[in-house]
């Protein structure tokens, strides 16, 4: 580790003292206030702001009584226990990324249940995000409109000039409509209800990283895969890369593979960079010309000077003052998000509090977010930004906002597109709740095939979408049941329910992806490892391991890496038995015993379930071992078996709905 030798003022002396103190005690980096970062709020401050913005609690008069009453409304909306208290689950919900429209009626957004009085709606894209190329943005918006035109008579036509019914733009913080954004995460976008003027307009926060939901979308130039997309992670010379790299080159240009294995396929292209091309402007895509002159000053890199929107640009000739030729600088593979660097790329290595960092770090933060400096020394320049993550799906967020632009309000159904909290869904389908809502406004799409109606005469067949399950209205066969961090979770498709009381009614449904992103929409089994309190999920022939809500690096992995034979293509259930701390994995009529300490399967297995677990059926749905209870529970269809751990005897057979779900 290296520190600067010259420190001209008190702050830098303080940095040395902090550095020496940390080195002596081997303590973690101190938490600091980053310039341009939003000030962390107390739970009470967060709640007052949240309830004011989304539930109408008066900002200056949200006293304890009003706060408690409004909190109950918010908790009811999200399927949480209606305590009126600021418990951990409520705070976690408030911190999740979401739409900026309110959850209760707000006449600035939705006056008098508005709708368009015509079926042909125009839209215009005024501005673009630098996170995606224009073609990808155009396609995302077109697909988002198609979500609604597929189930209604509405038809959407794009225009390039003049006033459209729906004007689409990106902006930061205060962007001209009186409803400012809030920086990275938090509030993602908002839209106004149908009507003249600002009615229908949809705005997206450009401090977010806009992707298609699975990380940066990088379209390459040149190479032998021109126009294709980077595939992250990819392998090159036996090493895994999660972003563009200059490895193997001596010209400094960043590149990526467009397949998972460059060593095998040899497909590559160059990642966006201002030395290769620019976007927009009037420079016809020409690369930046460095240095270039602007207002008499010389610039040797992209700048935001002369602009109020924070977008980086450059001259495409050596003299902008003379030629007036310019373009916007494309986001590079390591462009920062948020912070105060205006999208400038990370610079590695960089110095922070005297230490050298060769990659993104969470040092100095208490929220775990990864960041980097955009110069070689944060200590000198204090320029920084967040490192790219999975980002937010522009298609999904736009489809939600365009629902508002059609007149829909937020839905309490967590499986609905119109639910306020953002959740990435890989294979998206419009829910029945969304379809019902939009068709109440605009009737059924004329393209829907006619069929028998509810009355004696013919009528349109309603469009069907996935329905969110209700515990006591449907006989649910659960995909998995597990105790994780002291709570019992019940999983069904992409939904879950949770409770701390084994005999109390669980809260939910909640979307699994809001807690454990990157899982498939249906799991086969789940358990918590007692060694490290990691949650382990199984689906098909793979498994996922999570620390809290973060997927561990290198996952998912194949079942064979656990020691299961290749013929096991899925498992039925898994649990860790408190009696011996071993994990038992069930598939069909067999089970395996896994040693968590040694991280290996025990040689004595597999065995037949019937030979060791008297009375336990084959093809289980789930197994739950309750901590310190002395019992294990086996779930099959609508019933469960309670086994006493000490005697291995089944002591009870009961109905899941009445004994576990409070029905």
Curated annotation (Swiss-Prot):
Q: What's an example GO cellular component term for this entry? A: sarcomere
What region holds the Fibronectin type-II domain?
A: 225-273, 283-331, 341-389
Specify which residues bind Ca(2+) 1 according to the UniProt entry for this protein.
131, 206, 208
Residues annotated as binding Ca(2+) 2: 165, 197, 199, 201
* CC cofactor note: Binds 4 Ca(2+) ions per subunit.
Reaction equations catalysed:
Cleavage of gelatin type I and collagen types IV, V, VII, X. Cleaves the collagen-like sequence Pro-Gln-Gly-|-Ile-Ala-Gly-Gln
User: What does UniProt say on post-translational modification here?
Assistant: The propeptide is processed by MMP14 (MT-MMP1) and MMP16 (MT-MMP3).
Q: Where is this region: Collagenase-like 1?
A: 107-218
Main location class = secreted
Q: Where does Zn(2+) 1 bind?
A: 99, 400, 404, 410
EC top class, as a word = hydrolase
- SS bonds (residue pairs): 230-256, 244-271, 288-314, 302-329, 346-372, 360-387, 472-663
Q: Which Pfam families match?
A: fn2 (PF00040), Hemopexin (PF00045), Peptidase_M10 (PF00413), PG_binding_1 (PF01471)
Where are the Hemopexin-type repeats located? 475-519, 520-566, 568-616, 617-663
Give me the residues that bind Ca(2+) 3, please.
182-183, 205, 208
The compartments listed are:
Secreted, Extracellular space, Extracellular matrix
Q: Give start-end ranges for motif Cysteine switch.
A: 97-104
Which stretches of sequence are listed as region Collagenase-like 2? 394-468
Q: Which domain of life is it from?
A: Eukaryota
Q: What is known of its domains?
A: The conserved cysteine present in the cysteine-switch motif binds the catalytic zinc ion, thus inhibiting the enzyme. The dissociation of the cysteine from the zinc ion upon the activation-peptide release activates the enzyme.
- Which protein are we looking at? 72 kDa type IV collagenase
Upper classification of the source organism reads:
Eukaryota, Metazoa, Chordata, Craniata, Vertebrata
